[in-house]
Amino acid sequence: MSLLAKIVDGKNLSFEEAYELFNELKGSDGVLIGAYLAALQTKGYTGEELAGLARAMRDSAVKLDLGKVADTAGTGGDGSSTINVSTASALILSAFTRVAKHGNVSITSKSGSANVLEALGLNIRVSPERAREMVESTNFTFIFAPAYHPALRPIMPVRKALGIKTVFNVIGPLANPADPAYQVVGVNSPELLEPVAEALEFLGVERALVVHGSGMDEVSPHRETLVLEVGNGVERYTLSPEDFGIEPVKPLPCSSPEESAARIKAVLGGSGRREDRDFILVNASAALYASGVAEDFREGLEMAREALGQGMLEKLEEIACLSKS
């Protein structure tokens, strides 16, 4: 039975079969790629399948050795159209530890991490050598998925043409070629929490949080956030704004990468609206906790708050300049 027939039949793939599937996809034409993506989306995916696809994607990527790094990313596709908070929290996290932010331009939302970082002045297409230099000098680099995953080239236009969420929304945050030790992964559906956590265990992450914040692939600053913490096994719990020491506040919508960048800069500079600031802070707190920098979420939020206005805009300028040199 072919892999496609097995998926259409509703049967799950093993890690090895999922690994093989990625290698088959990268050599296929658009019709077959579309069939695979639609069939997988209809069937749903297991943690083992996600891990096999992500491992194959990492193994096919441009090699990158940055040492022990952290990453913050979401699956996108939640329809919330808020500021790009995972990018903002990654920048704050880099004030404390090394970050290799893996991301792409928008596929299913108005603004991907690459779009926002370009609007913030970064060159998003940096070589492995420049990425290492950036991490060593600033604690931050951006890993632009299309530049580091040449195997995705035949797949990207099919994803765009389909215009629906696919398995690549989910494995994108799992396929960072820098092999991060620490991660926060936001998922757009509660049903993805367990398979993504299982995949992270398969991939050998040291510590990770998989989060879904009341409809968002982020930590919510105004409602409950479901969390699966991966480390020594998997622990499930719920976070509320009170766990961070803040009053609930609803995130505001955002219409473009340029608007997102301007609002992120305002917060990094120590101003900005409370709705943006607290949204960024709770997510930065989660990243600081997942990376082992903060002992708990309240401490993480206070550490992130203290970083705002304390040279963060200058740090952003340094990152942008180094990315272009």
UniProtKB/Swiss-Prot annotation:
One of its GO terms (cellular component) is cytosol. Anthranilate 1 binds at G74, N104. Binds 2 magnesium ions per monomer. SUPFAM superfamilies: Nucleoside phosphorylase/phosphoribosyltransferase catalytic domain, Nucleoside phosphorylase/phosphoribosyltransferase N-terminal domain. It is an enzyme of class 2 (transferase). Keywords: Amino-acid biosynthesis, Aromatic amino acid biosynthesis, Glycosyltransferase, Magnesium, Metal-binding, Transferase, Tryptophan biosynthesis. The keyword Hydrolase does not apply. Anthranilate 2 binds at R159. It comes from the Archaea. The keyword Zinc does not apply. Its EC number is 2.4.2.18. Its cofactor is Mg(2+). Pathway: Amino-acid biosynthesis; L-tryptophan biosynthesis; L-tryptophan from chorismate: step 2/5. Mg(2+) 1 binds at S86, E218. InterPro entries: Anthranilate_Pribosyl_Tfrase, Glycosyl_Trfase_fam3, Glycosyl_Trfase_fam3_N_dom, Glycosyl_Trfase_fam3_N_dom_sf, Nuc_phospho_transferase. Gene3D superfamilies: Nucleoside phosphorylase/phosphoribosyltransferase catalytic domain, Transferase, Pyrimidine Nucleoside Phosphorylase, Chain C. GO terms for molecular function: anthranilate phosphoribosyltransferase activity; magnesium ion binding. Catalyzes the transfer of the phosphoribosyl group of 5-phosphorylribose-1-pyrophosphate (PRPP) to anthranilate to yield N-(5'-phosphoribosyl)-anthranilate (PRA). Belongs to the anthranilate phosphoribosyltransferase family. This is Anthranilate phosphoribosyltransferase. It comes from Thermococcus kodakarensis (strain ATCC BAA-918 / JCM 12380 / KOD1) (Pyrococcus kodakaraensis (strain KOD1)). The lineage of its organism: Archaea, Methanobacteriati, Methanobacteriota, Thermococci, Thermococcales.
